[in-house]
Amino acid sequence: EQIMTNQMQGNKAQFNSQNQSNVMPGPAQIMRGPTPNMQGNMVQFTGQMSGQMLPQQGPVSNSPSQVMGIQGQVLRPPGPSPHMAQQHTDPATTANNDVNLSQMMPDVSMQQTSMVPPHVQSMQGNSASGSHFSGHGVSFNAPFGGAPNGTQMSCGQNPGFPVNKDVTLTSPLLVNLLQSDISAGHFGVNNKQNNTNANKQKKKKPPRKKKNCHQDLNTPDSRPAGLEEVDQQSLPGEQGINLDNTGPKLPDFSNRPPGYPTQPVEQRPLQQMPPQLMQHVAPPPQPPQQQPQPQLPQQQPQPQPPPPSQPQSQQQQQQQQQQQQQQMMMMLMMQQDPKSIRLPVSQNVHPPRGPLNPDSQRVPMQQSGNVPVMVSLQGPASVPPSPDKQRMPMPVNTPLGSNSRKMVYQESPQNSSS
């Protein structure tokens, strides 16, 4: 049967040697059945077959069968050398087998070289790899050889490349975000729009494939995730700086969590930025732990996105969830108009920030008990309330009281003298 399959391969392969890309799946599927035997027996036969079957099998059928033998014998390197020596009787087999050796020795380069346009090589590589994956056959590499190598390379590299680009972009963006939140919000949104537009242009071609590939390639995305995590873990230095910057802004953060859901609205559609941004969103709840903790109950119950509030210690899970959210929002971005998302985002981001800053100023004022001090200030009209409002949250309240009393005394003799 194997000899018949070899003869079938030899005839078909020689006859269709140019169209092997179309024909080889048939004989390769024929090979699938005896492939476990092919690897074992054909290695033995090839020595005999090469002398006997060469006129029939010609370069092609020997080359896949012996490529199979070669893969089978890659573990047994002395094997292919005599077969190769026997195969050198045909220059074509030598060429094919040399190519197949170069292709087949590294399996990874095989899958890549299977992409090589000469279908003879690619299909031989596929048939050999199919025989190597005897269960899968050519169907494993042939459709996927074109698809995953094509699409996975796109899925692997395109997400990889924009991720890397965005990582490079985000490091300054995050610095800007943390230095100036509002302007960085615009700046980040603008760049994110550009990035998302560029990414959309990329994603229009295989949107579903990429979603599937992201979900399937989370393991390979673990590399870009690893890149992001490495950058994000390298960012804790920046985060420490950022936390120092956010330290005085923490009252803003205590009020800002209502702004957070709007920001993740930015961040979720903004596809690759978010994991870092979300972490930066997440760490602010952490610094309040260092600083006044009562803000944490404010931040957590308030409508922050649940991932940053809970997995503060679970940033890795956060990153995974965020990547999933990214993937979901990537499709949402594909489906929804970006403007419909971004405009409310840009609109929502700033109104919360607008009131938040005065609220953040007002909250410490009320906490500092400015109202009685204001009452005392209202007595001496000479004291301008507006500059003192800035001073109010400071512990200057007691000296302000004493100053107000002094002012009252000074005014009272002035009034009496006048």
Curated annotation (Swiss-Prot):
Entry's Gene Ontology molecular function annotations: chromatin binding; chromatin-protein adaptor activity; enzyme binding; histone methyltransferase binding; identical protein binding; nuclear estrogen receptor binding; nuclear glucocorticoid receptor binding; nuclear retinoic acid receptor binding
Name recorded for this polypeptide: Nuclear receptor coactivator 6
Start and end residues of each stretch annotated as NCOA6IP-binding region: 60-214
Compositionally biased tracts (Polar residues): 84-98, 358-370, 399-418
Residue stretches of biased makeup (Pro residues): 282-310
Gene (UniProt): Ncoa6
Keyword set, alphabetical order: Activator, Methylation, Nucleus, Phosphoprotein, Transcription, Transcription regulation
UniProt keyword Oxidoreductase, yes or no: no
Region (Disordered): 1-21, 77-98, 186-418
Subunit structure comment from the entry: Monomer and homodimer. Interacts in vitro with the basal transcription factors GTF2A and TBP, suggesting an autonomous transactivation function. Interacts with NCOA1, CRSP3, RBM14, the histone acetyltransferase proteins EP300 and CREBBP, and with methyltransferase proteins NCOA6IP and PRMT2. Component of the MLL2/3 complex (also named ASCOM complex), at least composed of KMT2D/MLL2 or KMT2C/MLL3, ASH2L, RBBP5, WDR5, NCOA6, DPY30, KDM6A, PAXIP1/PTIP, PAGR1 and alpha- and beta-tubulin. Interacts with ZNF335; may enhance ligand-dependent transcriptional activation by nuclear hormone receptors.
Compositional bias annotation for Low complexity: 190-199, 269-279, 311-336
Stretches with biased composition (Basic residues): 200-212
